[in-house]
């Protein structure tokens, strides 16, 4: 089968009126629309609640919502399945999700990566054609939206359950594609943990792992017979902010042949509230950057990740909770984060609003 897999879609203040008006031509260039033709699978990560609710949940970060017309646009565009495993689908609580699912069901658009409880969220999504079976697994890191126990939410990545889910899927399908929503935002390089995680998923049976969420194009590697893209960039987050630089406005559409396992990355760019395929020098510049970063390998990726972390040092120091923290305090915090048992204790003592079920 032929699959088109694209990243995060979230209408912005500039593009939402066009989504509400179902103005496909105002949102997608001709070449962008053509990408969706002739494929068996067209996947997009719907990173927004389609709702009119005013008040978002208690969280750090923005609450994203958009017009229900977004569902109509995606259906008309040719999207065949939406991924809902991300950190914004629950921004307006259960009612916001209910509204979103209602709009998707209204236009007949399937979704994956969300469930009425944790076990339900783990349902795999299969596509069958001419005797071939492909499985899509959409998972996210733990950031406000995830399912837990009997509570609804996105399908979270779990270092035990997800790998088992991939192994089970491989027994039932010819090809397994994992959409992993995670990684450090605005960083082109994967952390050592993310590299290990993605490689483990390939070892478990994934043929392709696409990391989304970071809003920026990262690095690529072939590993163990599989493909891993550490950072696909957005899909339609056009006009998010006038301050957004070049990195935010460039992204990759992924074309993948599930039988031959051939893969192609197609650079795309924002053009006001519209997106289009990159051409000429701009296209080559994007691909050249991807090749150069990918060639750095693990050591180079770690240096890039480490440098990005240090630029955010002051931000994370705030989490300690007081000014004048000493070197001893930093070492103590590092010890608590490093040791599994201490990490368990911290997680039990200090819970987010999501974990406390305050957003339900």
Task: Place the predicted regions along the sequence by residue.
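N-terminal catalytic scaffold of extracellular/periplasmic and nuclease hydrolases
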Residues: 1-85, 93
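Active-site neighborhood of phospho(di)ester-bond hydrolases with catalytic His/Asp-centered motifs
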Residues: 5-7, 42-47, 77-87, 110-115, ...
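Active-site environment of divalent metal-dependent phosphoester hydrolases
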Residues: 12-14, 50-53, 87-101, 118-123, ...
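Binuclear metal-dependent hydrolase catalytic cores centered on His/Asp/Glu-rich metal-binding motifs
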Residues: 14-30, 64-65, 124, 128-176, ...
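A short C-terminal boundary segment appended to hydrolase-like catalytic domains
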Residues: 17, 246-360
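Short acidic, glycine-rich surface-loop motifs adjacent to enzyme active sites
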Residues: 39-51, 166-189
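Active-site-proximal segments of metal-dependent phosphoesterases and phosphodiesterases across multiple
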Residues: 53-75, 175-207
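Conserved beta-sheet core of the metallophosphoesterase superfamily
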Residues: 78-81, 192-251
């Amino acid at each position: 089968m032929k699959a088109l897999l694209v990243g995060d879609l979230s209408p912005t203040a500039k593009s939402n009126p066009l989504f509400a008006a179902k103005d496909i031509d105002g949102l997608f260039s001709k070449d962008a629309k053509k990408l969706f033709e002739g494929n068996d699978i067209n996947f997009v990560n719907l990173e927004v609640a389609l709702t009119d609710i005013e008040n978002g949940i208690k969280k750090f970060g923005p609450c994203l919502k958009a017009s229900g017309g977004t569902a109509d646009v995606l259906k008309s565009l040719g999207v065949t399945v939406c991924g809902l495993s991300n950190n914004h689908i629950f921004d307006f609580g259960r009612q916001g999700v209910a509204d979103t699912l209602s709009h998707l069901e209204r236009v007949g658009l399937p979704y994956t990566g969300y469930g009425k409880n944790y076990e339900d969220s783990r349902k795999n999504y299969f596509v069958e054609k001419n005797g071939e079976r492909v499985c899509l697994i959409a998972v996210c890191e733990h950031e406000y939206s995830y399912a837990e126990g009997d509570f609804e939410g996105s399908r979270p990545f779990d270092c035990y359950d997800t790998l088992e889910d991939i192994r089970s899927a491989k027994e039932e399908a010819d090809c397994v594609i994992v959409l992993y929503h995670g990684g450090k935002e605005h960083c082109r390089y994967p952390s050592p943990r993310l590299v290990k995680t993605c490689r483990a998923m390939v070892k478990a049976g994934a043929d392709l792992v696409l990391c989304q969420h970071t809003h920026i194009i990262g690095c690529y590697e072939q590993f163990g017979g599989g493909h891993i893209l550490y950072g696909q960039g957005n899909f339609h987050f056009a006009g998010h902010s006038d301050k957004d630089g070049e990195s935010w406005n460039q992204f990759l559409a992924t074309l993948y042949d599930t039988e031959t396992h051939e893969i192609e990355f197609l650079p795309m760019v924002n053009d006001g509230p519209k997106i289009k395929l990159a051409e000429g020098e701009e296209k080559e510049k994007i691909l050249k950057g991807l090749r150069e970063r990918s060639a750095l390998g693990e050591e180079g990726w770690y240096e890039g990740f480490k440098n990005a972390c240090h630029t955010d040092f002051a931000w994370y120091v705030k989490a300690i909770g007081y000014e004048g923290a000493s070197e001893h305090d930093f070492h103590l915090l590092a010890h608590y984060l490093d040791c599994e048992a201490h990490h368990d204790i911290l997680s039990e003592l200090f819970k987010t609003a999501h974990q406390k079920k305050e957003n339900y």
